[in-house]
Design a protein with these regions (language model features):
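Alpha-helical segment of the N-proximal tetratricopeptide repeat
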Residues: 7-30
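Short inter-helical turns and helix N-cap capping residues of alpha-solenoid HEAT/ARM repeat scaffolds
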Residues: 15-16, 46-47, 77-78, 108-109, ...
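Non-membrane alpha-helical segments in proteins
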Residues: 21-26, 48-60, 83-87, 118
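Core register positions within helices of long alpha-helical scaffolds
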Residues: 26, 57, 88-91, 119-122, ...
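Ankyrin-repeat and related helical/solenoid repeat scaffolds used for protein-protein interactions
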Residues: 231-305
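Amphipathic alpha-helical scaffolding segments comprising HEAT/armadillo-like alpha-solenoid repeats
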Residues: 1-11, 32-44, 63-75, 94-106, ...
Length: 323
């Protein structure tokens, strides 16, 4: 062991917690290739700040024994330690790393369960499906929110019914919103009732998510509902509805999209122009020409592109009919 590393090793066991904490912070910047053996003992240091820094220093190390040591840190008595553990564990990339976290999905206080669910989400571990489904009925909103996130990542059709129920009835707006977004992985129209119902949710963010998800799924049966959403009290919802009407090439949306070209919010005017270009109906030419005088330069630019798109589409259509 070289002199620098020897000094760090001595500082790691110093009687002064501040010295130990600074040694932990310095360790990743040393030239030592394998710092894990020096860091792991500091996970059980008597000082919470030392434990916290040791956790942070272990970020990016995904060997099984490291994950096995980090997972129990979610149960630490110190909230700062638990938070750091949750952040580091949520950066895991390998599916097999979910193993040590699975037992924590249904045990411990709500904060621990929520952190564990968040950590396994991106790992897409099939073993997390059952605990996540069970957690949809947890009394704690943060646990339910993370459970919905896990199911959204897993994309298992068996969860669609439960997610639709959560989207409609969970008492927390954010949980309902995430559930609506999670329904976006469905490949059938079975989610249509849940999504159209969500367009009338009391929370505007839920309605916003529903309008976007309907376009993502290209559910043309939702066009009448999206047209109604163009009258939503929140312009953010109208923006998503306009975007989806464009993706669906919904001619039924022309009147509401044209009306939006004079809205005070430029973002809505932009989306309306884009949607009219995507729909490609010649009835939109005159309103789009008027949009060339819009005070927002982006709206004017997009209007020119939309007009060019409609003209080219009509030309191609005419040439196709004549051949």
């Amino acid at each position: 062991m070289d002199t620098v590393l020897q000094t760090l090793a001595e500082r790691l066991v110093d009687a002064d917690a501040t010295v130990r904490r600074l040694a932990v912070i310095d360790l990743p910047y040393s030239e030592e290739d394998d710092i894990v053996p020096l860091l792991l003992p500091r996970l059980i240091d008597e000082d919470a700040q030392v434990r916290t820094e040791a956790i942070r220093a272990l970020e990016g190390f995904e060997e099984p024994h490291v994950v096995q040591a980090l997972a129990p840190m979610l149960l630490d008595l110190d909230p700062g330690v638990r938070k750091a553990a949750g952040e580091v564990l949520s950066e895991l990339k390998e599916p097999q790393s979910a193993g040590p976290l699975l037992p924590l999905l249904l045990q411990g206080p709500p904060e621990v369960r929520a952190l564990a669910l968040h950590a396994v989400r991106a790992l897409r571990s099939p073993e997390a499906f059952g605990p996540a489904m069970q957690s949809l009925r947890d009394p704690d909103a943060s646990v339910r929110r993370e459970a919905v996130g896990v199911l959204g990542y897993l994309k298992d059709p068996a969860a669609i019914g439960e997610l639709a129920e959560v989207a409609a009835n969970d008492p927390e707006v954010e949980v309902r919103r995430i559930a609506v977004g999670a329904l976006g992985y469905a490949s059938t129209v079975s989610v249509l009732p849940a999504l159209t119902r969500a367009l009338t949710d009391s929370g505007w963010m839920v309605r916003d998510e529903a309008a976007q998800t309907l376009g993502k799924l290209r559910l043309s049966l939702a066009i009448p509902d999206l047209v109604r959403a163009m009258q939503d009290d929140y312009w953010q919802v109208r923006v998503k509805a306009a975007r989806s009407l464009g993706l669906l090439k919904a001619e039924a949306g022309l009147p509401s999209l044209v009306a939006s070209l004079t809205h005070t919010i430029s973002n809505l005017r932009k989306e309306a122009v884009i949607a009219l270009g995507e729909i490609g109906d010649t009835r939109a030419i005159a309103p789009l020409e008027a949009a060339l005088a819009d005070p927002d330069p982006d709206v004017r630019k997009i209007a020119r592109l939309a007009l060019a798109s409609i003209v080219l589409a009509q030309k191609a259509k005419a040439e196709g009919a004549g051949s």
